[in-house]
Amino acid sequence: MSLIKSISGIRGTIGGKPGDGLSPIDIVKFTYAYCATLPSRKPQPNGGKYKIVVGKDARLSGGMVENLVVGTLMACGVDVVRIGLASTPTTELAVMFAKADGGIILTASHNPRQWNALKLLNDKGEFLTAAEGQAILDLAAAEDFNFADVDDLGHITEHDYTDEHLDAVMALEAVDVQAIKDAHFKVVLDAINSVGGIIMPRLLERLGVECVKLNCDPTGDFAHNPEPLPKNLTDLSETVVREGADLGISVDPDVDRLAFICENGEPFVEEYTLVSVASYLFERAAAIAKKEGRTLAEVTAPYKPVSCSNLSSSRALRDVTEEYGGEYEATAVGEVNVTTKMRQTGALIGGEGNGGVIYPASHYGRDAMVGVALFLSNLAHKKMKVSELKRTYPEYHIAKNKIELSDKGLIDRILEEMKKEYAAEEINDIDGVKISFESKRQWVHLRRSNTEPIIRIYSEAPTLAAAESLANEVIAIAERVINDQN
């Protein structure tokens, strides 16, 4: 059994004793704490009562968790908009569409089928701040309950916001619907037997794309490991080649992450999902600026020609941004950190290297539907194969390693030693320690795990061998620190 409580929500394996797994008791406690802190986040509801949107992915435990969450919300005197099976970005947008005061997404994202989670949203359909999340954790731990009287119980309404979500995607100025239709694309979609199998085929149909469905029945019985990594997408790769498709599309169970497969069955690599979309947006804006004699900033307004991603994401985003005269900003790991920086800088595009695309013209949340529509627009304009498109971007490779420690106290010592060892290089310590070697176009990022005595190590270089070599170099330094303590 596992239960992980964090400022972004609560997740765990279903079953077990309270506090050991995601039990009914934990679900009720956490939902109550979310309700009880509503007035501190939003002193006045939009209507007579506070109203919360609840959406879920297709996990086997989704119905049970949904009933507990909805019942607890009603018991707190909160009205509920139950939207049923829905992607994470659909639920986020539904908060705005319904003029609700918040939302709860029931999904454990890329975690296996035995996991589920509650992810909490504010009245903008965005994740809560660290302070807001901590207040909920504190109240849940206090177990000081006070529920509504019978005359003040909340009520339920039901609505499917899939069409409203798709309407919003189709209406985006940068989505060239006609160009996509004229290209007559054929794609293979792997939706992991979750909600992507509901919404993504409908988007592709509206874009005039022929869709071969793979694992698109939303049973929640995941056909393979749900994280959209190349090693989990062999069936998709083989089907793309067999069907003679233009590309393959893979989404995770809640459809906020996205990965592509080239027409030859090779992975496009999820790090390059955001890179490709950003390159399209900046190239498009630069072309308009040149044609109309305007500045890049004038074309991208009301947004700035800025891109954002976290410290562990590929340098390729920075490269393509600067190629067209834009600026790049790095953030701490975590979607809320990326969206916060995007708001501060007015960024045009942002996201994370795990295939998460955040396009503020739609909303401040990762959205695979937006990512697909922008990627297909890019592909339609470029008139080239996906494998050829991939080769137009700077080539980088990321190696992922970790150091397991018996003493969590060693983490800070190791990170400090890295800063001393590489004092002559560019260092960023907003989230662990990232060391950049500009002349070699390499970097290494060491960051602590929030739940385990582990340092995660991400390194990137123009070749995988160089990335692994850099990781081994910092691991050797870490081992030296560990041995000095023994």
Placement of each model-derived feature along the sequence:
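N-terminal small/polar loop signature for handling phosphorylated ligands or for N-terminal nucleophile
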Residues: 36, 40, 44, 50-115, ...
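Phosphate-binding and adjacent anionic-ligand microenvironments
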Residues: 247, 293, 299-486
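Short glycine-centered, acidic/aromatic-flanked micro-motifs in structured strand/loop junctions
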Residues: 54-57, 189-191, 262, 361, ...
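Proline/glycine-rich low-complexity loops and linkers
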Residues: 83, 134-167, 171, 262-353, ...
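Gly/Ser/Thr-enriched, mixed-charge loops and adjacent short helices
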Residues: 13, 116-243
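Gly/Ser/Thr-rich active-site loops/lids in small-molecule metabolic enzymes
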Residues: 213-215, 266-285, 368-377, 381
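An N-terminal, well-structured beta->alpha segment
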Residues: 1-71, 75-76, 155-187
